[in-house]
């Protein structure tokens, strides 16, 4: 249901009619085929109900897979989808159930794996998200969005992080999003006078704030925990995410729900 809300808010007011397919994969080829109908009904019940409330059509698709990531990319590439939206899983979520699951997993790691010298990065949220994001982005032939749920309800106060000329594509997504939510957006420009394409970046942001209502340029130039005060959604590029997830880990503890986008 949350992923449906994200997709609707991000794309319902785009140039093209919104056509959605909800894909659910069960990992493990030993699933009894007689049980798949029941799995499908249970899996898609909430999202079909949500789509009906929003007044949109949605296709549902259930697959059994031995390698979910590879199969998702294969479906996207072979069947001509023009955007892939995936969830980041529980590792970066701050919902109570997900936090409990993460704590359990950390406890399980400490109790059972450390004695075998297993690499702790297996259970490190940043590494897990980075690996998943990298795979989808590198193997998909369309733009990819990886959604991190931090109690998402509505993207009404959006922060858009710009670090290079390549990040300006985010402003187009922000403009479409605001048409759906009628909210506001603020741009945090991390670029400096020595950043390649600095003038193009300034012009792009200026044009965005002049042309799109309820948009502003923030005075600050760096991400801190306080940067996210008052915001409930962040748009950030995959490249910039990789940088801030490495160098601004403390700030990201306070981040709102986030969509990490590839061009």
Regions found by a protein language model. Give the residues of each.
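Short, well-structured alpha-helical segments in soluble
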Residues: 71-79, 224-226
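Short amphipathic alpha-helical segments
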Residues: 4-8, 73, 130
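Charged docking surfaces used in two-component/phosphorelay signaling
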Residues: 63-69
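Short, surface-exposed alpha-helical segments at coil->helix boundaries
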Residues: 41-45, 198-202
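Non-transmembrane accessory domains of multi-pass membrane transporters/channels
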Residues: 1-44, 52-57, 167-169, 178-181
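Short beta-strand elements in bilobed, periplasmic/extracellular small-molecule ligand-binding domains
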Residues: 54-61, 185-188
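Intrinsically disordered or low-complexity boundary/linker segments at protein termini
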Residues: 1, 87-196, 202-263
């Amino acid at each position: 249901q949350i992923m449906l809300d994200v997709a609707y808010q991000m794309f319902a007011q785009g140039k093209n009619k919104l056509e959605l397919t909800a894909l659910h994969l069960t990992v493990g080829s030993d699933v009894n085929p007689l049980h798949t109908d029941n799995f499908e009904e249970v899996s898609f019940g909430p999202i079909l109900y949500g789509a009906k409330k929003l007044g949109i059509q949605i296709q549902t698709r259930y697959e059994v897979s031995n390698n979910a990531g590879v199969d998702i990319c294969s479906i996207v590439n072979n069947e001509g989808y023009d955007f892939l939206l995936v969830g980041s899983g529980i590792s970066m979520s701050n919902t109570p159930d997900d936090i409990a699951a993460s704590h359990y997993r950390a406890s399980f790691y400490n109790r059972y794996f450390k004695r075998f010298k297993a690499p702790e990065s297996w259970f490190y949220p940043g590494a897990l998200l980075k690996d998943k994001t990298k795979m989808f982005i590198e193997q998909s032939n369309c733009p990819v969005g990886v959604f991190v749920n931090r109690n998402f309800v509505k993207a009404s106060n959006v922060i858009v992080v710009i670090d290079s000329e390549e990040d300006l594509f985010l402003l187009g997504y922000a403009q479409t999003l605001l048409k759906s939510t009628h909210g506001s957006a603020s741009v945090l420009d991390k670029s400096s006078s020595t950043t390649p394409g600095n003038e193009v970046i300034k012009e792009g942001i200026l044009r965005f704030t002049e042309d799109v209502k309820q948009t502003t340029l923030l005075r600050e130039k760096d991400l801190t925990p306080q940067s996210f005060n008052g915001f409930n959604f962040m748009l950030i590029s995959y490249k910039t995410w990789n940088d801030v997830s490495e160098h601004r880990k403390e700030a990201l503890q306070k981040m709102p729900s986030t969509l990490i986008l590839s061009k």
